[in-house]
């Protein structure tokens, strides 16, 4: 199991498009992927769960991966956050 705190740095936070990209990325891996914010833990493979976190810019999420490809999943998710979900701002 890997856990890391990841900041939300894109201007619009985890809005619908960013949530969809996150869910799509998480779903590409066999391992379990969870996000936690303010005590609420959700499955990152569920777009409704991800959007329920209402994570705006400046929020910090705990990302947890657990399973056979956990490191690859964590690397991909960290890159997605760092790249601002491809939004460039």
What are these regions, as identified by a protein language model?
Residues 1, 48-52, 74:
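Detector for methionine-enriched segments
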Residues 1-5, 60-62:
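Intrinsic-disorder/low-complexity, polar/charged segments enriched in Ser/Thr/Lys/Arg/Asp/Glu/Gln
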Residues 7-56, 88:
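Compact, glycine-rich, soluble single-domain proteins
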